[in-house]
Amino acid sequence: MARATSDAGPAAIRQRQAQRGLTRLMVRDMRSLRRIIIPSRLEATVPAWITAVRALVDQYGAGSSALSADYYEAERVAARVTGSFSVPLADSPPEEQVENGLRWATKDVWPRDPDDPATTEAQRQPMDVRLEQAEKKAEAVAQKLVVDQGRDTVTGAVQRDRQATAWARSAALGACSFCKLLATRGAVYKQDTADFQAHDGCHCGVVPVFKGQRFELSDHAREWERLYREFAAPHSGDQLRRFRLALAEHGHLPGL
């Protein structure tokens, strides 16, 4: 008889919590780097700050990969599959990707002509406000880059492991509508072309599924699936918006 596994199983929840704990430590360390940026010397200090943050992304990304490898190996043992398998750790993100993300996060700190119509409201704010907003954006960018390494470690292992059949998305109760929609698809991902779609600040996890296992959506994911099918699926081109509204109306978007 096939053994059941779920997006809300104890191991999947612990893995999400471990990754969140890791990124909290990274954010703490990032905030200590803010002093590197000197408003009167942006051209010299912003690049230095980017270099320092990039080192943190490498450091914590390696930790995310290691956590995910341990998680995958434990799930493989729990599934009682045969044969040995060594989990390959995902590579660090390219330097260009990290730098582009951090440059985007800090784009509003640079001086602008307040009378220029192209200057946005965010760019007209006092420097301390602009720096605070840049820091929040940068933290979300770095968080995704770090956790992506862990998620890529699991999806990469599933693609290479002959005993793995698929992977599923594990979304928290407080996840956004986009993540909840993808989580309702269950264990349908296996191919090399099936990338894990994530946004800045995304804390979703990956659940590997092995031979002899049967994946089951959690109760809350089944409810998300019902809401999508009933309120959004028939409306082509407007499905995500309608799904978001349905989640909010039924108490599944606590952030709204």
Would you name each region that the model predicts?
Residues 1-53, 148-256:
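Activation/maturation switch segments at domain boundaries
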Residues 2-158:
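N-terminal alpha-helical interaction blocks
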